[in-house]
């Protein structure tokens, strides 16, 4: 019991360091967005990278993910969730970008061409 009270009475250095790193990452993202001459897509990728690092930092420093008995399982589940989210977002962007340029929607015909607008055998 005395061990737990001594454990809770120390200064929260881990939280201070996490907060300071979060501020630094936010200011770096602001600097990249405002003061660099990079292209918009490069800025976007860099800011997303900083956001991903900051999310991991928040989870590890403030959410105490690794401090329980099954901390490894929590980290694994979180990484799997991030992987699933990244696959869904990047897959959606890929599908939208790859199929937007086919041009089927530009000529007024339904996708697949005019030959598919009426199904054979269903004409009245």
Curated annotation (Swiss-Prot):
<dbReference type="GO" id="GO:0016682">
    <property type="term" value="F:oxidoreductase activity, acting on diphenols and related substances as donors, oxygen as acceptor"/>
</dbReference>
<dbReference type="GO" id="GO:0042773">
    <property type="term" value="P:ATP synthesis coupled electron transport"/>
</dbReference>
<feature type="transmembrane region" description="Helical">
    <location>
        <begin position="44"/>
        <end position="64"/>
    </location>
</feature>
<comment type="function">
    <text>Catalyzes quinol oxidation with the concomitant reduction of oxygen to water. Major component for energy conversion during vegetative growth.</text>
</comment>
<comment type="similarity">
    <text>Belongs to the cytochrome c oxidase bacterial subunit 4 family.</text>
</comment>
<dbReference type="GO" id="GO:0009319">
    <property type="term" value="C:cytochrome o ubiquinol oxidase complex"/>
</dbReference>
<feature type="transmembrane region" description="Helical">
    <location>
        <begin position="78"/>
        <end position="98"/>
    </location>
</feature>
<protein>
    <recommendedName>
        <fullName>Quinol oxidase subunit 4</fullName>
        <ecNumber>1.10.3.-</ecNumber>
    </recommendedName>
</protein>
<dbReference type="GO" id="GO:0015990">
    <property type="term" value="P:electron transport coupled proton transport"/>
</dbReference>
<feature type="transmembrane region" description="Helical">
    <location>
        <begin position="16"/>
        <end position="36"/>
    </location>
</feature>
<dbReference type="InterPro" id="IPR050968">
    <property type="entry name" value="Cytochrome_c_oxidase_bac_sub4"/>
</dbReference>
<dbReference type="GO" id="GO:0019646">
    <property type="term" value="P:aerobic electron transport chain"/>
</dbReference>
<keyword id="KW-0560">Oxidoreductase</keyword>
<dbReference type="InterPro" id="IPR014250">
    <property type="entry name" value="QoxD"/>
</dbReference>
<dbReference type="Pfam" id="PF03626">
    <property type="entry name" value="COX4_pro"/>
</dbReference>
<dbReference type="GO" id="GO:0009486">
    <property type="term" value="F:cytochrome bo3 ubiquinol oxidase activity"/>
</dbReference>
<keyword id="KW-1133">Transmembrane helix</keyword>
<dbReference type="InterPro" id="IPR005171">
    <property type="entry name" value="Cyt_c_oxidase_su4_prok"/>
</dbReference>
<keyword id="KW-0472">Membrane</keyword>
<keyword id="KW-1003">Cell membrane</keyword>
<keyword id="KW-0812">Transmembrane</keyword>
<dbReference type="GO" id="GO:0015078">
    <property type="term" value="F:proton transmembrane transporter activity"/>
</dbReference>
<dbReference type="GO" id="GO:0005886">
    <property type="term" value="C:plasma membrane"/>
</dbReference>
């Amino acid at each position: 019991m005395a061990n737990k009270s001594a454990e809770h009475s120390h200064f929260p250095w881990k939280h201070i360091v996490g907060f300071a790193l979060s501020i630094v990452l936010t200011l770096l993202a602001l600097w990249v967005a405002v003061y660099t001459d990079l292209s918009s897509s490069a800025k976007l990728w860099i800011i997303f990278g900083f956001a991903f690092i900051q999310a991991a930092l928040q989870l590890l420093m403030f959410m105490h993910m690794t401090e329980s008995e099954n901390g490894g399982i929590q980290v694994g589940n979180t990484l799997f969730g991030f992987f699933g989210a990244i696959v869904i977002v990047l897959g959606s962007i890929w599908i939208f970008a790859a199929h937007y340029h086919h041009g089927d929607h530009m000529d007024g015909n339904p996708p697949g061409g005019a030959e598919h607008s009426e199904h054979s055998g269903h004409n009245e």
